């Protein structure tokens, strides 16, 4: 008999508490109108990739360790002579997380990684795009426990985009605040 998979902590929190709280706060007519997180995109741009084409592959390995799923090496869309960049050159890595892996990553991000960021004063509450999506940047990828600090040859920053079904920024802010995102006051 197959064992039942454990439900991620944040997914259970959303299903049990957050949905009800958002339904009461915004008075939705239909349960499908309640905002939810659809995906989390992690992007790591490697600026020095023009000199060394192996760096995006190393960044992709680190990103795969952080995300728990294989990262895709991103390539330049067009050539830029001033940056010595040619079309098709590898310039970074990205990974898209959905479902259980997304909730597990958000749990690790909020409870472990963000408190380890140096001089962390909270997330910028204005980083919403107007359609309910939130973007943030981390200057050092070594704040994640999956990365062994001794084996890292270079420290990279990364972008984290949280995509939601919220129609407005206020709905998205309430959703993420319910997930204990530490927004600056």
Swiss-Prot record:
GO terms for biological process: translation. One of its GO terms (cellular component) is ribosome. PANTHER family: 60S RIBOSOMAL PROTEIN L11-RELATED. Part of the 50S ribosomal subunit; part of the 5S rRNA/L5/L18/L25 subcomplex. Contacts the 5S rRNA and the P site tRNA. Forms a bridge to the 30S subunit in the 70S ribosome. This is Large ribosomal subunit protein uL5. Keywords: Ribonucleoprotein, Ribosomal protein, RNA-binding, rRNA-binding, tRNA-binding. It comes from Brucella canis (strain ATCC 23365 / NCTC 10854 / RM-666). The lineage of its organism: Bacteria, Pseudomonadati, Pseudomonadota, Alphaproteobacteria, Hyphomicrobiales. This is one of the proteins that bind and probably mediate the attachment of the 5S RNA into the large ribosomal subunit, where it forms part of the central protuberance. In the 70S ribosome it contacts protein S13 of the 30S subunit (bridge B1b), connecting the 2 subunits; this bridge is implicated in subunit movement. Contacts the P site tRNA; the 5S rRNA and some of its associated proteins might help stabilize positioning of ribosome-bound tRNAs. One of its GO terms (molecular function) is rRNA binding. Belongs to the universal ribosomal protein uL5 family. Gene3D superfamilies: 3.30.1440.10.
């Amino acid at each position: 008999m197959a064992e039942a998979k454990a439900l991620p902590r944040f997914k259970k929190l959303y299903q049990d508490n957050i949905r009800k709280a958002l339904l009461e706060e915004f008075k939705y007519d239909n349960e499908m109108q309640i905002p939810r997180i659809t995906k989390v995109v992690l992007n790591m741009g490697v600026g020095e990739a023009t000199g060394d084409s192996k760096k995006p592959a190393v960044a992709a390995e680190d990103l795969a360790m952080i995300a728990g799923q294989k990262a895709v090496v991103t390539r330049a869309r067009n050539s830029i002579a001033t940056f010595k960049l040619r079309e098709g050159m590898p310039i970074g890595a990205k990974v898209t997380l959905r479902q259980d892996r997304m909730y597990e990553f958000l749990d690790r991000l909020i409870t472990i990684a963000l408190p380890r960021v140096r001089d962390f004063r909270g997330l910028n509450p204005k980083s919403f795009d107007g359609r309910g999506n939130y973007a943030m940047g981390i200057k050092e990828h070594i704040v994640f426990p999956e990365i062994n600090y001794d084996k890292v040859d270079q420290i990279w920053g990364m972008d984290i985009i949280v995509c939601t079904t919220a129609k407005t920024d206020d709905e998205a802010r309430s959703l993420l605040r319910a997930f204990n995102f530490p927004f600056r006051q």
